Design a protein with these regions (language model features):
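Non-heme di-metal
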Residues: 1-191
Length: 191
């Protein structure tokens, strides 16, 4: 069984930094959901948004706890992935844009968590957190995509959901490429 790296080592600091980025993304996602609560007022959406918000807060807690259990200290992340995506995307024009932004960010989170879980040498405690958050992300994607398509259909423009999602994806790919390049450079400098 893989053990946690020793505090003070480069490997330890890198893991804590990555987990701090995950935590920040979950908190940023929770803030976005609070905005959505004001726009989606029907009872079904309110129920799903509240569950989704609870999941995001729990995910942030799981990453906080994992870092603490390792003996680490949270990194203050001020320029994380979701922050960058939000700056680049700008203010969503309507609920469909808000849902598309959420869908694309959730999709990236799921991909990132699944990729991390497949890496060699991931310890069991971190795998446990990765599995827990990945399971929730699948439900988040399903309900957000369904709601976005429902709203587009109700507005008489079913393709609007696809256009909004593709617009966000194009922006997200640019943001992600920059983020990954900077992360690789940080990891290179740390070794």
């Amino acid at each position: 069984m893989k053990l946690d790296p020793k505090p003070g080592t480069r490997e330890f600091d890198q893991r804590v930094r990555v987990m701090s980025f995950y935590r920040e993304a979950e908190l940023h996602g929770a803030r976005l959901l609070l905005v959505m609560h004001k726009h989606l007022r029907d009872p079904d959406s309110q129920m799903k948004l509240t569950r989704h918000l609870a999941d995001e807060a729990r995910h942030a807690f799981l990453w906080t706890k994992r870092i603490s259990d390792m003996g680490g200290t949270l990194h203050n992340i001020i320029d994380g992935y979701q922050h960058r995506l939000g700056l680049r995307f700008g203010v969503p024009k309507d609920t469909i844009d808000l849902l598309a932004l959420t869908s694309v960010a959730e999709s990236r989170a799921l991909e990132r968590y699944q990729s991390h879980a497949k890496q060699e040498g991931v310890d069991e405690n971190t795998l446990e957190v990765l599995r827990a958050v990945s399971g929730d992300e699948k439900w988040h994607l399903a309900w957000v995509d369904a709601k976005m398509r429902e709203i587009a259909k109700d507005r008489g423009d079913e393709e609007r959901a696809n256009r909004a999602t593709e617009r966000v994806r194009a922006i997200e790919r640019e943001v992600w490429a920059t983020f990954v390049a900077e992360e690789a450079e940080l990891m290179r400098l740390a070794t």
